[in-house]
Amino acid sequence: MAPSLSPIRSHHVAVIGAGAAGLVAARELRREGHSVVVFERQKQVGGTWIYTDHIEPDPLSVDPTRSVVHSSVYGSLRTNLPRECMGYRDFPFVVRSGVSESRDPRRFPSHGEVLAYLQDFAKEFAIEEMIRFDTAVVKVAPAAEEGSGKWRIESTEKEKKKWAHRAV
């Protein structure tokens, strides 16, 4: 006789970042029945694919009070992988009918097209409802209760907050 599988226990799980990996992790964790919160420091999903033309006022990092620009994307960036390799298995990265004509149908899309794909994915699977935007994680550490398996997360929104989650 085959051993019986015990049901998966639902946990409170934190995902840090709403980029490509964070979005699919959040979706899969929720599919498994977990309570998921995604911490995202930006105002939108997309992670590294969010483009800004802002530059740091102090590129040598001399001023410790400088504003820091988090972007590795430049204006003319195109992917070096074809879109067929970049999509999720059950949500292909194809040009969708009925969307804006400004979408980029080329095989090696621009950063804007990748960002739009990730935004479409988040909408399709209602992931945005799990995301705390404008929330930077500043510290993750095991919770004080030894053996609890929980993690303490400190984040900044308008004020510093602390959260306890089973997995991070």
From Swiss-Prot:
Cofactor(s) this protein requires: FAD
Residues that bind FAD: G17, A18, G19, A20, A21, G22
UniProt EC number: 1.8.-.-
Example GO molecular function: flavin adenine dinucleotide binding
Enzyme class name: oxidoreductase
Keywords: FAD, Flavoprotein, Monooxygenase, Oxidoreductase
Transmembrane segments: none
Domain of life, source organism: Eukaryota
The keyword Oxidoreductase is assigned to this record: yes
Protein family according to the UniProt entry: Belongs to the FMO family.
Listed PANTHER family: DIMETHYLANILINE MONOOXYGENASE
Function summary: Catalyzes the conversion of methylthioalkyl glucosinolates of any chain length into methylsulfinylalkyl glucosinolates.
Protein name: Putative flavin-containing monooxygenase FMO GS-OX-like 11
Organism: Arabidopsis thaliana
